[in-house]
Amino acid sequence: MAYIFVNVNRSVGTINPNIYGQFSEHLGRCIYQGIYVGQASDIPNTNGMRNDVVSALKALHVPVLRWPGGCFADTYHWRDGIGPKENRKTIVNTNWGGVTEDNSFGTHEFMELCRQIGCEAYFSGNVGSGTVQEFSDWVEYCNMGGISPMASERRANGQDEPFNVKYWGIGNEAWGCGGSMRAEYYADLCRQYSTYLRNYSPEHKIFKIASGANVADYHWTKTVMERAGQAVDAVSLHYYTVPHEDWQHKGSATDFTDEEYYTTLHKTLQMEELVENHTRIIKQYQGDRKVGLAVDEWGTWYDVEPDTNPGFLYQQNTMRDALVAAINLNIFNNHCDTICMANIAQMVNVLQAMILTEGSKMVLTPTYHIFEMYKGHQGAKQLESYAETTLLNHDDQAVPDLHVSASQQADGSILVTAANLNDTAAIPVTCMLGGAKPTGVTARVLAGAPAAHNTFAAPEQVVPAELNTSLTADGFTATLPPCSVATFVVNQ
């Protein structure tokens, strides 16, 4: 028997819905074919957006969507993607597969996608190969409600009212594909760019996010905060879970050993250390204003599926990935006092995707189901939680058998999310809710073998199911199957 303790009277704050953000890049089949098929397509669509994909994403209550990259962002010139499609410039996507990019999906199309999904837009601007003027013009084009050259151009392209885009990333991975910059050089650029990213309405202030560190590059965070911390609202962090150190042989998404399973989970758990250490640096230099941490790229990264373009980053998605998602989201929930946003990579057909498509077919991944099961945390009050765990040791890589987070809705109901990381043993759990008076409990579970996944031929191999649970005087009891994620909703 394992114990989960939740203290209803202790909280670090409200869970920002943006922690459940998504990311879509002009990469492989994420945008084209995955989301956007064009109005002439035989695949049912609304203004070019796949109806099936949009419907599935709406069910997740997606709060914010990052675009157009990724590495693509620092080669993207936004004017190439506005105006009549027949006049748009065709370019080569040099970062991802060397394919032709016709720019038929640009600013207006992306905002239409956000409108259909019901989410905020997060634009990643071009610092690597763009100019301050170009970036400044993009903000004006999107957000100026009065009379100006950019606002007039937007209206000429069919959008009278401003888009009021709130979130703006000042470059992407400036230490790498975004310009191979030193931290000192980027920090000065960030401060310069920030100066010209203006607010055009007191009711719609923009939120500026600096290009942050890769993994444990604490020098980067320190330098950016020290030199440009007063010019931004958040600093980003990128951390991918990669089973093997060799990027040419990262490991298979579906064919992996027990050792690789636990290595993947062990590396995922390192996210907490990274969040805490980068946050400590941010707080040291933020002064009298609060600067957040935006984990705007995270997720698993494996070798691509056989016989697919290596530049498309297409990979399958198993119960192992579901556990990775659950661990990360639990960590983000429990650090919601500092994490203002997180964006899993990526939404469709790329890396740890929510959705896979093949022609007119669509399949929901185990990761999709985790986001659906966890959506009740969005905007809720985080609650202090603790799991009494047993360490699972595999080649000196210890992994706890349980990983949890909890929150409380405005109506008093409590959501407890718990992952059983043990791939062979079920865990009977007793959850004690200190300060609560439970009157009822319902539960769902996502479970399966670590390599279990959904395919186009068998799309419901891994789907949520009801979980038997019993109410107690101060909580509930249940048994978590091996390799599973469960959600418990407790009414009071």
Label every model-predicted segment:
Residues 1-234, 268-272, 276-304, 308-492:
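Non-catalytic accessory regions flanking glycosidase/transglycosidase catalytic cores in CAZymes
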Residues 237:
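Histidine-centered catalytic micro-motifs
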Residues 240-262, 308:
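Active-site His/acidic residue clusters
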Residues 265:
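Gly/Pro-rich active-site loop or hairpin
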